[in-house]
Every structure is written in structure tokens, then in C-alpha cells.
Swiss-Prot record:
Gene Ontology BP annotations: L-histidine biosynthetic process
Name recorded for this polypeptide: Histidinol-phosphate aminotransferase
Swiss-Prot/TrEMBL cofactor(s): pyridoxal 5'-phosphate
EC number: 2.6.1.9
NCBIfam families linked to this entry: hisC
Pfam families (UniProt xref): Aminotran_1_2
Family: Belongs to the class-II pyridoxal-phosphate-dependent aminotransferase family. Histidinol-phosphate aminotransferase subfamily.
Species of the source: Clostridium botulinum (strain 657 / Type Ba4)
Classification via PROSITE patterns: AA_TRANSFER_CLASS_2 (PS00599)
GO MF: histidinol-phosphate transaminase activity; pyridoxal phosphate binding
């Protein structure tokens, strides 16, 4: 620990991301990436973007990308905010909408970045305890003094909250912002975007990392009424006006436009997810119902950590969380059908030997 560090730097507990192995032979099912490549139109746009105008700064407002996303969701361009991945937008949002003296509510089992942002900005927060089946009790979010954050579908559980429940939380917090983090919404859930016109306190955050196969380009976006977006821009422009580079912006536009490819890939992920759930059930695993591109699994008589280690020994990498209430669960990203067949074969071998 350096004597030059500030007190915040000394005391903060940073987010720990999933392992990124260098061994290309590993079947990587630990960070919820899409098993399929970006749209061919995206790859062509990237090639075309390698021009001499890269010497110039990009559009700080990302107008072309905002217009593309706005058209896709039947919103105005002024209701769209672009960020360097949804994580950056979440960080900006915590600073834009939440006050230190007011308690923000999010679930006790949810995205691990939320408490990091809260602690970084010295925000008070309350952890709403999920039920035993990992579902949200919406009463825990009623009259949140500082605002609320909901991951839908939730991570790492994959549990989806109905649109009616989201509406109720919005109506119970009309004077505070409710953030709905929809990183995984395209794998079977119904987005809250349709509620924006009726709820000025709703901010929906999505990413192109999962369903659009662009995790390597870091593009996220927020959707909400104009005043919320204005607030986000005030904070963004107090840090860095140029958060999105030219190439990423062009790639993102083509990704949004190629609806046919998007639907094809998400459909394959959903089909493979359902197949995997069925196969795991046959050998005694309990699988939490999922609307995401991952599943949350446990086996009553075997420790999850041991299964995690043995899978890793077999070059299959999944995610283990050594945390209260979920230490006997594994989160498994849905890979290609071929990868998931290998995963099932390996986990069968492990269970038979334990």
C-alpha cells in the first residue's frame, strides 16, 4: 500500500472480473460472452473504418449511433446515451442520480459492481435480500429513499423480473430514479424500454457485449426520458467527452442494424441453454430458471468449488463465487452447442467419480 494513495484508494474493494485465460484450448464459460462472432456486416464496417480520419477525434455525442438505437427502440435521439460499456454508464448513473445522504437499494445477490460504485461515491446503500428461490421481493424496493437498481435478468442467478413487477417498483418510487440493468434482456426477457414514455424516473441500461457479440469493443447505452439523459451527459462531460472511438461507433451501428443475424444468434443461445438445462437435470443438478445467456447450478451432495476445480483441470472454465448464500453454486455461460456437449460430458465424468 503506497503512502501516496488517497483514503478512498486505500479502502476501496475493487470489482474482480472473470478470469481471462491465455490458453486458447480452454472452453471458456465464465464471463458470459457470446459464443458466436459479430455480424459479418460489423466486421466489414471495422475494415472500412481503418481510414486516415482516425487522426481526428470522434463525435463526442455519438449522434449517428444514438439515432440508430433511437430508431430501433422507437425513441428520440435525445432519449439515448452512449457509454464505454454499460459498466461506465452504471458508474456515471450512480454519480448522476444518487445522493450520499440517501439510501440506494439493490439486491444482496446481484452485480458485484454496485457496492463498488456506492462505496467509491460514499453512498449509503441497502441490500434487499432475495428469496430462497433467488426471486426479488418487490416490497423491499418500496419507497427507496435514494433510488433503486435492478438487474433484469439478475446476475449471477439469471432470474427474470416481470414487467408488471418493474412497473410496481417504478410507481413505488416516483420521486427517485430506478435503474434497470438489462445486460442480458435479449435472451428471453421482456425489456422495460416500453415503459419509458410513462415513467420519467426509469433509466434502462443495456450493452452490446452479450447479445451483439461486441464485448471486445466496449459499447453500452442508456435509454430514458430527456432530463435523465441530460444529467448523464453533464457527468460524462466532466470526465471525458470522447468515450467512444470511431471504429467502435461504426461497428455498433451495423450491429444494431443487422436484426436478422442478432435474432439468429440469440435464438441459438436460447436453444442451447434449454438443452443444457435439460441435460443437467438428468444427472441431478438443480438449475435456477434463467432468461440470460448463462445458468446458475448446484448439486446437493457435491461442493461447487470442487466441481469448479475439476472442470478447470479438464480445460473447462466456469465461474465460482465464494460468497454467502451462493458458495455452492456455479455460473455457467452458454457456449456453442459443441462446447456445451463437451461441458456436459466432462461434468458427467466428474460427478461419476466423486
Amino acid at each position: 500500500m503506497s503512502k501516496y494513495w488517497s483514503n478512498i484508494t486505500k479502502n476501496i474493494e475493487p470489482y474482480v472480473c472473470g478470469e481471462q485465460p491465455k490458453n486458447k484450448k480452454i472452453i471458456k464459460l465464465n464471463t458470459n460472452e457470446n459464443p458466436y462472432p459479430p455480424s459479418p456486416k460489423v466486421l466489414q464496417a471495422i475494415k472500412n473504418a481503418a481510414r486516415d480520419d482516425l487522426r481526428l477525434y470522434p463525435d463526442p455525442n455519438c449522434d449517428a449511433l444514438r439515432k440508430t438505437i433511437a430508431n430501433y427502440y422507437n425513441l428520440s435521439k435525445e432519449e439515448v446515451f452512449i457509454g464505454n460499456g454499460s459498466d461506465e454508464i452504471l458508474a456515471f448513473s450512480f454519480l448522476t442520480f444518487f445522493n450520499p445522504e440517501e439510501t440506494v437499494v439493490f439486491s444482496d445477490i446481484s452485480y458485484s459492481f454496485y457496492p463498488v460504485y456506492a462505496n467509491l461515491y460514499k453512498l449509503d446503500y441497502k441490500l434487499a435480500k432475495l428469496r430462497e428461490d433467488f426471486s426479488i421481493d418487490i416490497n423491499d424496493f418500496k419507497n427507496a429513499k435514494g433510488g433503486a437498481v435492478i438487474t433484469n435478468p439478475n446476475a449471477p442467478t439469471g432470474v427474470y423480473l416481470s414487467l408488471d413487477s418493474v412497473k410496481q417498483i417504478l410507481e413505488d418510487n416516483v420521486n427517485k430514479v430506478v435503474i434497470v440493468d438489462e445486460a442480458y434482456i435479449d435472451f428471453g426477457g421482456e425489456s422495460s424500454v416500453s415503459l419509458i414514455k410513462d415513467y420519467p424516473n426509469l433509466l434502462v441500461i443495456q450493452t452490446l457485449s452479450k447479445s451483439r457479440s461486441l464485448a471486445g469493443m466496449r459499447i453500452g447505452f442508456a435509454l430514458g426520458q430527456k432530463e435523465l439523459i441530460k444529467g448523464l451527459n453533464r457527468i460524462k462531460n466532466s470526465f471525458n467527452s470522447y468515450t467512444i472511438d470511431r471504429i467502435s461507433s461504426l461497428a455498433a451501428i451495423e450491429s444494431i442494424k443487422d436484426e436478422e443475424y442478432f435474432k439468429e444468434c440469440t435464438s441459438k443461445v436460447i436453444k442451447t441453454r434449454n438443452w443444457t438445462i435439460n441435460e443437467l437435470g438428468k444427472i441431478g443438478f438443480k438449475v435456477i430458471p434463467s432468461k440470460a445467456n448463462f445458468i446458475f447450478i448446484t448439486y446437493d451432495t457435491y461442493e461447487a468449488k470442487n466441481i469448479f476445480v475439476k472442470l478447470k483441470d479438464e480445460n473447462v472454465l466456469v465461474r465460482y463465487f465464494n460468497k454467502y448464500r451462493i458458495s455452492n453454486y456455479l455460473r455457467v455461460s452458454i457456449g456453442s452447442k459443441e462446447e456445451m456437449v463437451i461441458f456436459i460430458d466432462k461434468i458427467k465424468e466428474i460427478i461419476n467419480k466423486l
